[in-house]
Amino acid sequence: GRLETGMTLPAGVHDLAQTVQQGERTVTIHPAAVETPTGVVLVDVGYPGELDQVEAGLADAGLALGDVRAAVITHQDGDHAGALAELVDRTGVVVYAHELCAPYVDGREHPVKSPEDQRYEPVDVDIELVDGVRFRTAAGPMDVVFTPGHAPGHVSLHFPDSGTLLAADALTADESGLAGPSEEFTLEIEDALDSAERLAERDLR
């Protein structure tokens, strides 16, 4: 698969691009499926009510929802964590999120960018992540990189063997490649710029 930057993903990592209408705008987001020795790990799950698009993306990769064993949520926003409740109901996946993100996912805190009267359905976080946690995958190690700024407890995922980065919203991307964080959508811009510098120190290809 390919992400919006045109970056080629290593074998075992698949782009699950999801397109939704947001009023007048058409928005495309990029959950990913990562194959591991014990099943598929989803990195983010997309909008509420759009799990069928995740299923379709998995099918395009020769995978199925029944292959999914875990979901790693990069941060609390509804376009990344919104479909979690439906996913857990249907598959019983293990949910991972950073320790500072977990309260927003599980309902102890209200998602910081959601209106007070609405949020996606809360879901228990089974395992709370910290910086440096490593997953074994078909594409080699997948390392959790703590990248706060855009949202509390934001993480990115780095594959050192291929130099691949799933930045989530720590960076922005367009046709010309990766760029720094978007000030418009970032809670703590100084933290976000520090996070971008940390990512820049990694081997990215």
Positions of the model-derived regions?
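Conserved beta-strand hairpin/beta-sheet module of binuclear metal-dependent hydrolase folds
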Residues: 4-61, 156-168, 172-173
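Short Pro/Gly-enriched beta-strand edge/turn motifs at strand-loop
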Residues: 9-20, 112-117, 138-140
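Divalent metal-coordination and catalytic microenvironments
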Residues: 34, 44, 54, 75, ...
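Well-ordered beta-strand scaffold positions
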Residues: 39, 100, 133, 140-142, ...
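Metallo-beta-lactamase
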Residues: 48-49, 141-148, 152-205
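Active-site HxH/HxHxD metal-binding segment of metal-dependent hydrolases
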Residues: 49-53, 57-134
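Internal catalytic-core helix/loop-beta-alpha segment
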Residues: 126-139, 144-148
